[in-house]
């Protein structure tokens, strides 16, 4: 929090109801940060009703009592932005967990504050502008080599700008002045920004470049654009967290912000232990060097879940303003919505559907609308892609959080418990999922992958839909009762499912599949389907066509890094088998 002049107007606690407390005699504005009780717990003003100031407390309120003092800081909830964010692990209100561990061991005590960034560490600042240059809000003044990522030091968005009077390179802490403008404005590497306010941009752009994730079902059938929004709803155990972690590991965003919002502590532990060991495929450095983690597990106070979501998106916007592509994972937005429901009921507000507050949709859209591909104030192009997991109770997609999320996001990756029970992973149901970015991304796929890619994708989806229609008949009378052509369609659909859609997140090669390989795999399956149709026209039986041995080698391609020679051999053998069939 800001350590400037704190307007510590004193009030008194009147009522305590879990994380929601009421104070009287306090001079406060909406969203002011306050210190509650003798232990000075951190809270935020969420409602003002006459004399009553209603506060949500970001720490456990057990043991505080009416009559204790409440102090107003006069500041809104803000995050510290500057060098040192990357590789950090924060709680929901940007307290670095590593610093808290040093202060008090593994269990966080109440009323302890720690700055989001180290104010002692020195960073090597290299100016990119010189004395006499004119700068405006958002302009880049210089760079700091933070990790492998270059951190760009910018003029704060609310600054007036002007001519540079003095700027110097060298080692500085985040608090020290690196640039002085002619009007006397001093600029340090540290910025503070209120989390509920979106950072300003010059222009929003149409999202027309895909965020490549290396997951075949996502890149191939339901792509998300850079600056896009996606939801991953699914019942428990269907693979939401693993899918989120795969996206955090392999998506081609330059910065990843991962928010563990009210999820199990074990899952956050997995992320915290895995990420430092994983290698970024593009740089060969640890993945953690491009990651900011916000750990806010389910046993932490519920009010901090809301703060963690806003903290994460504000950090993501900061890196976007530098010109980076950022992907933000929120796991899970349902836990945040449940926190809203709990606080709303404590405020005795009129409940909406299933007890959620009437403003649920507004809060969700407020969050997702901060995604986008933009031109920032300094002319750099950057993006924030938001991927939110949703955990509907019992896998019921008709519940309010899922339905309101679907109204806002443009990509829907529907996880299916039945698929996960059949050990089909990622368990994304190809019939229920959709992407509204397909038309916008077609041109990119034509140019960067192949002009054949879009027709190939449409063909694959057509085969999978045809299989779903035939499945009822197959379950009643068996596949042998189908016409010859449709028996082969069932086999081709099985190949698409098992060879293309299934992917092993724990295999060193198959965990990430580049677009070129996805295209070659899909083309190989289509080539088999074309050869099979030609053979059937020539009188071959479905049993002969399905019995082609070389096609059984195709699944092995997934696990071979330099797959091209092996794939070429399989295709050659396949053509030879079909030629031999025709000769008979």
UniProtKB/Swiss-Prot annotation:
It comes from the Archaea. Component of the A-type ATP synthase that produces ATP from ADP in the presence of a proton gradient across the membrane. The A chain is the catalytic subunit. It is a peripheral membrane protein. HAMAP family: ATP_synth_A_arch. The gene is atpA. Keywords: ATP synthesis, ATP-binding, Cell membrane, Hydrogen ion transport, Ion transport, Membrane, Nucleotide-binding, Translocase, Transport. Pfam families: ATP-synt_ab (PF00006), ATP-synt_ab_N (PF02874), ATP-synt_ab_Xtn (PF16886), ATP-synt_VA_C (PF22919). It is an enzyme of class 7 (translocase). GO terms for biological process: proton motive force-driven plasma membrane ATP synthesis. Has multiple subunits with at least A(3), B(3), C, D, E, F, H, I and proteolipid K(x). Its EC number is 7.1.2.2. It is found in: Cell membrane. Its main location: membrane. It catalyses: ATP + H2O + 4 H(+)(in) = ADP + phosphate + 5 H(+)(out). Belongs to the ATPase alpha/beta chains family. One of its GO terms (molecular function) is proton-transporting ATP synthase activity, rotational mechanism. This is A-type ATP synthase subunit A. One of its GO terms (cellular component) is proton-transporting two-sector ATPase complex, catalytic domain. SUPFAM superfamilies: C-terminal domain of alpha and beta subunits of F1 ATP synthase (SSF47917), N-terminal domain of alpha and beta subunits of F1 ATP synthase (SSF50615), P-loop containing nucleoside triphosphate hydrolases (SSF52540). The lineage of its organism: Archaea, Methanobacteriati, Methanobacteriota, Stenosarchaea group, Methanomicrobia. ATP binds at residues 234-241. CDD domains: ATP-synt_V_A-type_alpha_C (cd18111), V_A-ATPase_A (cd01134).
